[in-house]
Structure formats: structure tokens, C-alpha cells
Design a protein with these regions (language model features):
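A short, small-residue-rich loop immediately preceding and capping a beta-strand
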Residues: 101-103, 127-130, 173-174, 197-213, ...
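Glycine-rich ThDP/TPP pyrophosphate-binding loop and its adjacent helix/strand module
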Residues: 171-338, 342-347, 466-575
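Non-catalytic terminal/interface segments that mediate subunit docking, oligomerization
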Residues: 310-417, 422-432, 528-531
Length: 604
């Protein structure tokens, strides 16, 4: 018998008499789930916890022009010659908040003038304005009635760090992943055209290297064959999270440099215009007013500087993409002394690469945040940054595996789902030994629902030939990476969370293939922990009264597929109740896999 309790599954032996579970210690069936829930809530709150911020009155005095703009309608009443002052106040307001709250900094500093110009020229929210990637939407949010709420950026119950249709009518389309804006804006434009609406404007602001994604190319290809009222604003800062890779970037620089032969966009029947300075508000307004009245699909090429106006962010654009806490005056970052899971990945891949010349690391546009900088420094040719191209990355790795290389694909869990068909068709069905290192698995905190990595267990577990490992801490992650390097019998995935690693004490322990482990053999009520939930399980057990705690045994599953049948048989044979804890959705996850195993093996 199973009961759903948030993330966990709870199994209770059907023939267990009620008094057996309660016994002399009066053990409550709700005790373990309740203890878990308390710690889960505490963990979630810790993701959002931020220092107190100065009161709003201070900002009103500091930024009087910004605090006079409560909506784009207010913005449009201002004279053009005062808009640079508004831009300065807006930029400094973002710096004040993000230095304390944490968030995406460089991209937002780079689009301050562009956001002002767009809302000045277009009739938002009637005109649909879509911000690609979403992490460059802070100026847009502040100008559209959410200035005060920005004090609670990325807090639980506060303002999302990404556009959200549920949050504001000014957010025409929710964006957290990249390269979706042109498709969405084109869909809206086609719908309005079919309804006879020829006046509504549809604007897709795409930047931070998102234009080079396959989905953006597909949308451009379709858009060029239409006569829709669509404007694409290319925010070209020549960098994503890391420097842009790929041939398109050279073409874009040629266009900005005046080399306009073989213009890629014109060959697709898209009207092309550009400005010389994406931080010159009068120039931006003039260009936007011009393209606004042109027929058909248009593209305005806008060069900007990522981190504009904050010297540290301009000089170190990679670090200040998402800097964490930093000193508002000096720009100095407030680093954490503890090692991250991502650091472990980089260190161990470097160690393995020194012994295996067939090892290559692939990443879709995120080498630095994924921990690969250390490997790229020593072996630059063995770290392949494919750009924002998850589908291509997976099939590229499959092709490399066909030729005897050992590719490790390092990708965020939330972005891996963009390449699901490639995992199924190109890797799993062909049983190719591609190693998937699934970063940011589980709950990732204030980045919110677009970035939580809670689906990977459910969509990988059903796949044929797939092995899936969930290390509980830094030591197990190191062991799992070494296991993956030796495993050539098919695809293998390792999922691990964001941030500081738990228990990274050096160890010589290896991870036997397909085996979990028993950590507390004491009792007849079993907890099976999956991955990083082990620390939560231990804390939950510690909260129980002594007599109840003695009845709880604890298991670290480690290998989610294949399951350790020997371990599970021991668990279900000796236990009156079994609780599984995982940081993923309940349907189709590790708990349901354990439940299915129990049913198949006579433990209904």
C-alpha cells in the first residue's frame, strides 16, 4: 500500500496490524513524512532567504524619476531628453537590488535603454512584447508596474526572475529557456492576422546568443515566408553566459561592421535594419518608430554591452552574468569557500582526461557554470561548446560515441528536456555509451519553475538501455564519474544538484555498479533516499524522539536504474513500512519505480 506525501512514497505492509506500527512507542505513521516535510520546507525557504533590504522610502528619495513611472503610460509622457536620466536611475536600482537578492545582472544592465525605448514606442500591453531567455527582463518588469515588487525579486511569494503570464499582462509569453520568442511572437501575429487585426504589433527581443539556436532558425525560416506584423529585435552583446560559439556570430559582426553582402536575414525575406549604439535612447526610438511602420517581418539589429554601466560587470562579463552576492560599491564577489558539485565535475573530468585521450566534454553554451573551465584550460580542444543547441549536442555526442570516443554531455536538467527525442532515438535505442551529467537536478531555488530539474527521473527511467545514478554527496559524485568513465555498455546518466557539495571528504571508495547501501540497519520502518535527499532524510530522522528513531532504517539507493534487487528484497522483507524520498515529481520517478518493483515481486 502506498501513500503520496509530497515528494515521497510511503509503503505499509498490508498485513501489518495497526499496533505493530504504533507499538509501545506510539509511532505515528505521519511522523516520518511530517519530519520530512518540515525539513523540505526549511530547505526551500533557505533557497529564498535573503538579507533585509533598505526601506522603499530610501529608494524613492534616491531615484525620484524612476519612482514617478508606475507604468509604460507614465513613461510615454516623459520628454525624450530626460530618458537617459531614467536609464541611469533604473540601472542603479537594479544594481542595488541584485547585489543583495542575487540574480542575473549583466544581461539586464545591457538592455536598460532598449527596454525604455520599446515601451516608449510601442503600446504595451496591447502590443505583445516577448523577452527571450527571460533573464534579461528586469528593466521591463520594473517599468511595467513591478518596481516596488522588485524589492522581493526571486523570493518565495515575490517577483519571478523571468517573465510570467500569471504575473502581469505585460508579460505576453513566459520565457525561462531560450530561443522561443520568435516562434511565440509569430504565432500571435498569425492569430491576429487571421482575425483581421492588422494593427497590433508583435515584438520578439532575442539576445544572449539565443539567435543561434535551432528553434530560432526554424522560426526565422517560417517567418520569412509570411507577411505578418512581426518585429525581431536582435540584442547583440556577442556573448551568452560564455563567449558565443559558432559561425553566425562572425556574420553578425560583419553586418555591424558594414559588410552587408549575403545578409542572412534578407535571404529569408526579412527586412533588416540596424542601429550603431544600443545604449543611445534617441537613436533607438527613431529606429523603432521607423521599423514599426514597415510591412511584413522586420529585424532590428541592436549592439549592446553586457554589464553596461557597472565597470566590474563590463570587464568580467562571464562572472557577472549571475554573480551571486557582490559588493555594490567595489563590485567584489562574496565567494563561498565550499566546493560545489560543479567544481567536482570539472576536477574529476580533468583527472580522467589526463588518463584517457578519448574523453571529451560537451556542453550547450554553459562551460563555465557547469564547472568545465578547469578542463578547458588544460585541454581546450576537448571541451566542445555547441552553443544553445541541446538537440544537436546530444546527437553530436552519439556520433562521437559511434567512433569510439567517450563523450560526457554536461547539461542542466531543465535544458536536457529540450533534447528528449535525441536521447530516445539517437542514444538509448541505439545503446550508445554517451555519458549524461545532469546538472541542477531537483529543486534549484529562486530561479523558479522554469529551471527546476524535477522531471529527469521520470522521463529517463522508462528508456531502454539507460543507466541512471543519483549520488547523495560529493564523494559519491566522484565515484559515479569514475564509474561512468569505465562504463561502455550503453548510455549512463548521473544527476546532481546545484550548489555546495555535501560530504566531500576524500575517499578511495568506489561505487559498485547497480548497488545501493544500508546506512542505518536498526528498525522495521525503512527510508530509501534518492540522491541529495539523503541529508534531508538524516535530518528528518534526527527530529524523531529517541524511541521512534530507533525503529527507522536508512538506505541510500544510489542507482535508480537498474534497481538493486537484493537491497530492495532485504528492505521489503524486514520492514513494516517503506518511505522513499526524492527531489523529483512523484509520477514515474524513483518512488514509483520502487513501488512497481515491490508489486512485481510479491510485496503488494
Amino acid at each position: 500500500m502506498y501513500f503520496a506525501l509530497g515528494f515521497p512514497y510511503l509503503w505499509i505492509r498490508q498485513d501489518a496490524p495497526r499496533q505493530t506500527l504504533r507499538g509501545k512507542t506510539s509511532f505515528s505513521l505521519a511522523a516520518l513524512p511530517s519530519a520530512f516535510t518540515i525539513f523540505a520546507q526549511t530547505a526551500c525557504r533557505s533557497f529564498f532567504a535573503t538579507p533585509a533590504h533598505p526601506v522603499e522610502k530610501t529608494f524613492r528619495e534616491k531615484y525620484p524619476l524612476l519612482f514617478s513611472v508606475n507604468s509604460p503610460a507614465d513613461l510615454r509622457t516623459l520628454a525624450v531628453n530626460v530618458l537617459p536620466q531614467l536609464a541611469e536611475e533604473l540601472r542603479n536600482y537594479i544594481l542595488d537590488i541584485v547585489s543583495v537578492k542575487q540574480g542575473h545582472l549583466g544581461s539586464n544592465l545591457g538592455v536598460v535603454e532598449l527596454a525604455i525605448a520599446l515601451h516608449y514606442v510601442f503600446d504595451t500591453p496591447h502590443d505583445a512584447l516577448i523577452w527571450d531567455v527571460g533573464h534579461q527582463s528586469y528593466p521591463h518588469k520594473i517599468l511595467t508596474g513591478r518596481r516596488d515588487a522588485f524589492l522581493h525579486l526571486r523570493e518565495q511569494g515575490g517577483l519571478s526572475g523571468f517573465p510570467s503570464r500569471a504575473e502581469s499582462p505585460y508579460d505576453a509569453f513566459g520565457t525561462g529557456h531560450s530561443s522561443t520568442s520568435i516562434s511565440a511572437a509569430l504565432g500571435m501575429a498569425l492569430a491576429d492576422q487571421l482575425r483581421g487585426d492588422s494593427h497590433t504589433q508583435h515584438i520578439a527581443v532575442i539576445g544572449d546568443a539565443s539567435i543561434a539556436s535551432g528553434m530560432a532558425f526554424e522560426a526565422l525560416n517560417h517567418a520569412g515566408s509570411t507577411q505578418t506584423n512581426l518585429l525581431i529585435v536582435l540584442n547583440d552583446n556577442a556573448i551568452g553566459i560564455d563567449p558565443v560559439s559558432g559561425a553566425l556570430e562572425k556574420h553578425l559582426q560583419d553586418l555591424l561592421g558594414g559588410i552587408d553582402t549575403d545578409n542572412f536575414f534578407r535571404t529569408l525575406h526579412i527586412t533588416y535594419r540596424q542601429v550603431s549604439d544600443g545604449h543611445n535612447i534617441p537613436q533607438l526610438i527613431a529606429a523603432l518608430q521607423q521599423v514599426k511602420h514597415l510591412p511584413g517581418v522586420k529585424l532590428l539589429h541592436v549592439p549592446t554591452i553586457k554589464g553596461k554601466g557597472f565597470p566590474s560587470a563590463e570587464a568580467e562579463q562571464i562572472l557577472y552574468h549571475y554573480p551571486g552576492h557582490f559588493d555594490r560599491t567595489t563590485g567584489l564577489l562574496k565567494d563561498s569557500p565550499r566546493i560545489r558539485y560543479q567544481d567536482i565535475v570539472g576536477e574529476e573530468l580533468l583527472h580522467l582526461a589526463r588518463k584517457d585521450e578519448t574523453l571529451y566534454a560537451l556542453t550547450p553554451a554553459m562551460p563555465t557554470s557547469s564547472g568545465l573551465s578547469i578542463l578547458r584550460t588544460e585541454y581546450p580542444s576537448r571541451v566542445i561548446d555547441t552553443g544553445i543547441a541541446e538537440a544537436h549536442t546530444l546527437t553530436l555526442a552519439a556520433g562521437m560515441a559511434c567512433r569510439g570516443l567517450r563523450p560526457f554531455v554536461v547539461v542542466y536538467s531543465t535544458f536536457l528536456q529540450r533534447a528528449y527525442d535525441q536521447i530516445v532515438h539517437d542514444i538509448a535505442l541505439q545503446n550508445l555509451p554517451v555519458r549524461l551529467l545532469i546538472d541542477r537536478a531537483g529543486i534549484v531555488g529562486p530561479d523558479g519553475p522554469t529551471h527546476h530539474g524535477v522531471f529527469d527521473l521520470s522521463y529517463l527511467l522508462p528508456l531502454p538501455n539507460m543507466t541512471l545514478i543519483a549520488p547523495a554527496n560529493g564523494c559519491e559524485l566522484r565515484a559515479a564519474l569514475h564509474l561512468a568513465a569505465r562504463y561502455d555498455r550503453g548510455p549512463i546518466a548521473i544527476r546532481y544538484p546545484r550548489g555546495e557539495a555535501q560530504d566531500d571528504t576524500p575517499t578511495e571508495e568506489t561505487m559498485p555498479f547497480g548497488q545501493g547501501r544500508c546506512l542505518r540497519p536498526e528498525g522495521d520502518i525503512a527510508m530509501i533516499s534518492v540522491g541529495a535527499m539523503l541529508s534531508v532524510a538524516r535530518q528528518a530522522i534526527a527530529r524523531l524522539p529517541d524511541e521512534q528513531r530507533q525503529r527507522v532504517s536508512l538506505y541510500d539507493l544510489r542507482c535508480v536504474k537498474p534497481l538493486d534487487a537484493s537491497l530492495l528484497r532485504e528492505v521489503f522483507t524486514r520492514s513494516q513500512a517503506v518511505l522513499t524520498l526524492e527531489d523529483g515529481v512523484r509520477q514515474g520517478g524513483a518512488g514509483s519505480a520502487v513501488a512497481l518493483w515491490a508489486a512485481d515481486n510479491g510485496f503488494p
